Amino acid sequence: MIQFILIQNRHGKNRLSKYYVPFDDDEKVRLKARIHQLISQRNQKFQANFLEWENSKLVYRRYAGLYFCFCVDSTDNDLAILEMIHFFVEILDSFFGNVCELDLIFNFYKVSAILDEIILGGEIGESNKKSVLERIEALEKLE
């Protein structure tokens, strides 16, 4: 199960966070800072994108200046989550046309809606790119 998702830039600024298990506000602030500290110091050439953290695993991937980090149960498949991150970024790229950090800042509600189409209650719900894009485009027409 996915516990939370963080998207942060290289400077540690949070661009999107989504929690599927309850955390106190103080805990959220603490874990955002701690996770950025852990991930940003790792060498991508020599270290994997998986990290044991407390009683969970952090699976992350860096795209340009953004870190996409998923915190999952320790029993979840690391590679499946890594592929889910890539799938999410592919959908963002298709929807926004070469997504950048500014797209996440000014269209955070759309990014959140895309994430809600893919992940339901901390579990992967939809894995068909075309289906997700059709639903998001239908929501766009309603605006």
From Swiss-Prot:
Keyword set, alphabetical order: Cell membrane, Coated pit, Endocytosis, Membrane, Protein transport, Transport
SUPFAM superfamilies assigned to the protein according to its UniProt record, in alphabetical order: SNARE-like
InterPro entries in the cross-refs: AP_complex_ssu, AP_mu_sigma_su, APS2, Clathrin_sm-chain_CS, Longin-like_dom_sf
Molecular-function GO term, any one: clathrin adaptor activity
Cited function: Component of the adaptor complexes which link clathrin to receptors in coated vesicles. Clathrin-associated protein complexes are believed to interact with the cytoplasmic tails of membrane proteins, leading to their selection and concentration.
Complex and partners: Adaptor protein complex 2 (AP-2) is a heterotetramer composed of two large adaptins (alpha-type subunit apl3 and beta-type subunit apl1), a medium chain (mu-type subunit apm4) and a small adaptin (sigma-type subunit aps2).
Similarity annotation: Belongs to the adaptor complexes small subunit family.
Record's protein name: AP-2 complex subunit sigma
Species this chain originates from: Schizosaccharomyces pombe (strain 972 / ATCC 24843) (Fission yeast)
Lineage start: Eukaryota, Fungi, Dikarya, Ascomycota, Taphrinomycotina
Gene that specifies this protein: aps2
